[in-house]
Amino acid sequence: MTVAAPPRFSVLTTVYDPDPDHLRACLASADRQTCGDWEHVVVDDASTDSAVGDVLDRSGSERRHVHRRGSNGGIVAASTDALAAAVGEFVVLLDHDDVLAPAALERLADAVDGADDPSAVDLLYTDHDLLRPDGRTAWPVYKPDWSPERLRNHNYITHLVAVRRSLVDDVGGFRPGFDGAQDHDLLLRVSERARTIVHVPEVLLHWRQSAASVATDTGRKPQAYEAGRRAVADHLARIGVDATVETGAHDGVYRIRRRLTGTPTVSVVIPTRGSTGRVWGRTRIFVHDAVASLVADAGGASRLEFVVVLDSSADPVVERGLGRIAGDALVVVPYDKAFDFSDKINAGVAAAGGDYVLLLNDDTELHAPGSIDEMVGLAQQADVGMVGAELLYEDGTLQHGGHVYNGTISHALLGWPGDHPGPHRLQAVERECSGVTAAAALLRRDVFDEVGGMSRELPHNYNDVDLSLKLRRAGYRIVWTPHACWWHFEGRSFDHPIDPAEVAVIERDWHHEIRHDPYYNSNLAPGRTDWLERPGRSGAPPYETLADGTVVWG
């Protein structure tokens, strides 16, 4: 007797009193999958609406197995029952009112088979959009490739998710007490052990907007966010990050406050000519105010020294003023060559005595107290190569939210209001990015030395791009944080034109990397920094429900 091989995918759906038409559409979307290697495990968590039972009664098929609980136990209990009944290689999570794209499972299978080692693929996720009450799709969410820091700050993955069944079992399945955040909790635990994590950059799920859904009103589920906060705190404890976790200023966002190890010394390296300018109605020596704003913020866990690489031609008043402001914490490195930003930074770091170096432009002023400790907290993680800060123009708009390399080299969300959370909470969360500006960037001194510092082939422009990409090539993550913030009066102190020779160097060394940003998305418009989708990517209704309940697909 031949025993049938188990299916590749077990789609798990827990049901509790959805709109019957929405449930019918959900089930139908599974039935019309172009991939045939699946089963659908449905657990009804004691729905009270008899119409829901009628839909389930009529939904039976060879691939669908409907189980009914005797009493309502909540989504974790129902999900645990569904997992126990599943036999597939991967489990796929599908909410009872959401709709799969017809090729969803086929695309997941292709992603597994196309990996360098298919047997090592443990977690997959896709892009999604929202399914409006009028049946049209809207607001696609085009996600980055794997971004662990962002997942700690909020569940950017959400839907659609497939996880290797054996790994789900290894981490203990769905944990009781995390109802409402059970998926986020599972993703965090799975990610700690996953060998390969694959992002499929296609909209393969339509997330229903309904009265009870977080997709419609994130403020409806405070208990879910509290469960998510505990999930993040538990995750950080498991991976050895000493931190507290709070619910953030925006729904679904968590604020992580990391404790520093010991009392680190941070060398603030500032190259300057001693330039002056007028900002907010006052003439200033930029480097004086840059240093004074940090001195005024003293009292954190980090000790500061100020390594100022000062042009020998600068007015003597500049150095005298720095001495009064910084006192014994000041180290002056005289510089008598033609302007070369990379050389100045390298000279400053060579003279630095700190465990960490903060690369800082002179035309900055601290905006958020505690910024340096925030950056050190991230940089003390062994796999973090560099930490970038939020930079604001003097009018309060965003100058820097991380780099974007999508055919151009740009600042993410350039010009957005500085207090806006940004699309998909981008401006409100710590997250990986391909690079950050050296106008305010912190890294461990040994890491700077490991990758050879800044390139002398890039004296004026793109030196921070090159540094970022060298760090990533060495296996480090680059993290941007909104919790460290400076004013940046860019162009007030110095504005150097782009040198074609420097463009040629970046093209020679990083041709592929500046065109393929893993933290952007191929569905987004190239050459932009605002996460605008390419034309024609969303909006069509995926199906229509007729008066008799029949689902007709578009």
Question: Which sequence ranges carry the predicted segments?
Answer:
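Conserved donor NDP-sugar-binding/catalytic core segment of glycosyltransferases
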Residues: 103-138, 365-408
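Short aromatic/hydrophobic "clamp" motif used to bind/position activated sugar donors
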Residues: 91, 357
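N-proximal low-complexity "stem/linker" segments adjacent to membrane-targeting elements
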Residues: 1-29, 241-293
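A conserved acidic beta->alpha catalytic loop
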Residues: 44-53, 71, 309-319, 365
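A recurrent flexible, glycine/aromatic-enriched loop bordering the glycosyltransferase active site
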Residues: 76, 84, 137-166, 179, ...
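Glycine-rich, basic loop-to-helix element that forms the pyrophosphate-binding segment
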Residues: 69-86, 335-352
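C-terminal, non-catalytic tails of nucleotide-sugar-dependent glycosyltransferases
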Residues: 1-2, 220-263, 395, 407-433, ...
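Short, acidic, metal-binding catalytic loop of nucleotide-sugar glycosyltransferases
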Residues: 27-37, 289-303
